[in-house]
Structures are given as C-alpha cells and as structure tokens.
Swiss-Prot record:
GO MF terms held by the record: DNA binding; zinc ion binding
Record region (Disordered): 1-81, 94-137, 330-355
Record-level GO BP terms: mRNA processing; snoRNA splicing
Family annotation (CDD domains): RING-HC_RNF113A_B (cd16539)
GO cellular component: U2-type spliceosomal complex
Coiled-coil zones: none
Gene: CWC24
Classification of source organism: Eukaryota, Fungi, Dikarya, Basidiomycota, Ustilaginomycotina
Zinc fingers, C3H1-type class: 197-225
Family stated for the protein in its record: Belongs to the CWC24 family.
Matches recorded under Gene3D superfamilies: Zinc finger, CCCH-type, Zinc/RING finger domain, C3HC4 (zinc finger)
Pfam families tied to this protein: zf-C3HC4_3, zf-CCCH
Zinc finger (RING-type) residue numbers: 264-302
The protein's name: Pre-mRNA-splicing factor CWC24
Listed PROSITE patterns: ZF_C3H1, ZF_RING_1, ZF_RING_2
Length: 355
C-alpha cells in the first residue's frame, strides 16, 4: 500500500495558474516556480528552491541600481542657470508659478545675477515713484496695519500708534484729498503754478456810507479809496504806463489838416458822427461799433483799439468849415442871381473909368 501511494503521488501532475491578459511579472513567475519545486518530494527540491530564490533576489538588487552622472560646473560668473532652483522645488513638491519665476541670487551662486537684480529693483522703484498717486504713503500704512506687521503679536509694546484697527475708518485720507491728513504729495507728471491774491479787508459799510457801527473796534480798514485786486488791474486798459500815456495824449494833436480824411474807410461815404481811435484813424461811430463787435482791431492798421473811440474834433471842425464855405458860396451865388446888372450900365461904368 505504501509503494502504491508513493507512485501515485509521484505521478500526480503539477498545476500552474496563468493570467490571460498582461505579462506575468518576474516575481510572480519565480514564486510559482518555487511553489512547484517545493511540492516535489526529497531534499533536493528544497535546496533547489532555496538557490532559485537567492539568485532572483540578487538579480532584483542588481536591476534596481541607478547610476547618475554629475555634470561638471564651470566657475564662470557669466554663465547663469536656474536648474538648481528647479530641482530643489521639484524635490520639495511645490512647483507654483511664483516659485518658478523667483530666482534667489544666494542659491544660484552667480555674481552677475546680483548686480542685474539690484539694477532692475532700482529702476522699478523709480517707475513706482513716478506713477504713484499723492496718497501712496497712506495706502502703504493701511496695508501694513492689515497685514499685522506693526501689531504687538510678539508681546513687545510699541506704543499707542501701533494698535491694530479692525474697523475701517472713512476719514483715512484715501477717499478724498480734502479730508486727508497731512501734506499732499506733489505729482511728478504735472506741474502747476498757483497765484494767490489776498483781499484788502476794507470795511464795506464805511466805504459805501462813511459810517461803521463798530467804530474804532472794527477789525477792517476804514478807507474810502478804491482797492483793486491784481487781476482787476490787469484787465484795465490803462494798467501799463505806455497805455496810460496813449490814453492821456490827444491822438489828433499831431495831425495836420491834410492828413484828415474826408470819408469813412469802412463805408466809403461822408462821415456821420465821426470818431477817432488811439492810432489816429477816423471812422463813423456806427461803422466803428459794428466793426468792434466782430473784431476789436483797427480796420486801417490792425492795432488793438481796446474799445476806445473818441469824438473826432478836428473832423467836426473841418466839416463845419466846409459847411460854412458852401453856405457862403451858395449865398453869394443866390445874391448874384437875384440882383443882375444891365450891360449898358456896365459899359458906361467902364467908359467913365477910362476917362
């Protein structure tokens, strides 16, 4: 019976399970082989299985070894790279956009990068100073308070000014320049010129009526003279000395009788209510007013009239003389026509004169 059982066990087939899809890994196949060999009888099978497992372990150890060749680094400061920073970020597992773009000069170890970063930061500061608004210092102060840089979180007391404000005040200086605290920073792109003209502080009651209820205790000046501001003096036509002399002088003093025209230059007709400008040109009053409504310059020479048209005395005198001469000639002609002398009387008068 024992011999029959031994022969039956020796003739029993070995069952091996295989996957239908995919290739079986090396570890699985070696395990199945070890199971099959261990199921066989005899000490030779166990020793064979032990040797197979040792060889597979040595093969797996030799296959997992990775050799990395180190690249040679040159000490040239002109050669720059960001490989070390990228490798460090990849190992830490945080590859964000800000970390990829930021390159630390100390980590890279390049001398040229330090100088270029300093130059770029200075240029950026100049651009910010030129483009910032007038309340940039208040904005930075607000951000510092929000971030808690000036707070007493570390236990060190820094005074009442460093207290953290959790409520946003309306009068923070950023919303309106009229309510801002402290001086306003001047813009760098716009240049302004300010002209300040102070009021004379003259007592209005005393100037207009000559009486003030406050008497000597009035804080305003008691003077009835005319006080004008700077812009009012500039508007006046006689503000300059040259213009004042031109106004005080008579424009018709230097004119002779031959220089006086006999007709208006605008309407080309005889004068009707003639006027003269400061530049000694004669026009009709209606023509001069119509011309001034369209253009304030003189029609003859193009100088500024200033709206001053004086009565032309010499033209009026000349017109009166012409009228008197015409009237006298008309009178003489009329008298001569009314009292004609006969021809024989003229002849006898001539004969008597000859004798």
């Amino acid at each position: 019976m024992d011999g029959a059982t031994e022969s039956g066990a020796a003739s029993s087939p070995v069952v091996v399970f295989k996957r239908k899809r995919g290739r079986a890994s090396q570890g699985t196949s070696s395990t199945l082989t070890n199971v099959a060999t261990s199921s066989q009888a005899g000490p030779s099978g166990a020793s064979r299985a032990h040797s197979d497992s040792g060889s597979s372990r040595s093969d797996s150890e030799s296959g997992s070894t990775v050799v990395i060749k180190k690249k040679r680094r040159s000490a040239n400061p002109l050669v720059q790279s960001t490989g070390r920073v990228y490798r460090k970020l990849k190992l830490s597992g945080s590859l964000d956009g800000e970390k990829e773009n930021s390159v630390d000069a100390d980590e890279s170890g390049d001398a040229g990068l330090t100088s270029s970063s300093i130059a770029s930061s200075s240029l950026q500061k100049m651009r910010e100073d030129a483009t910032r608004n007038s309340d940039w210092d208040l904005d930075t102060a607000g951000t510092l308070k929000e971030t808690g840089v000036t707070s007493n979180s570390d236990g060190l007391y820094r005074g009442a000014k460093s207290y953290a404000s959790f409520t946003r005040t309306r009068d923070d200086g950023c919303s309106s320049k009229m309510r801002s605290r402290g001086p306003i920073r001047q813009t760098t792109t716009v240049r302004t010129t300010s002209l300040i003209d102070y009021q004379p502080d003259v007592c209005k009651d005393y100037k207009e009526t000559g009486y003030c209820g406050f008497g000597d205790t009035c804080k305003f000046l008691h003077d009835r003279s005319d006080y004008l501001a700077g812009w009012q003096l500039d508007v006046l036509p006689n503000s300059s000395s040259r213009t004042r002399e031109n106004m005080l002088s008579d424009p018709e003093d230097s004119d002779t009788e031959d220089d006086i025209p006999f007709a208006c230059l605008i309407c080309r007709k005889a004068f009707t209510d003639p006027v003269v400008t400061r530049c000694a040109h004669y026009f009709c009053s209606s023509c001069a007013i119509k011309r001034f409504a369209k253009n304030s310059k003189c029609f003859a020479c193009g100088q500024q009239t200033g709206g001053l048209f004086n009565s032309a005395k010499k033209v009026l005198e000349r017109m009166d003389k012409l009228k008197q001469q015409k009237a006298q000639l008309r009178r003489e002609k009329h008298e001569w026509l009314q009292d004609p002398q006969p021809t024989h009387q003229l002849a006898t008068a001539g004969d008597s004169d000859v004798d």
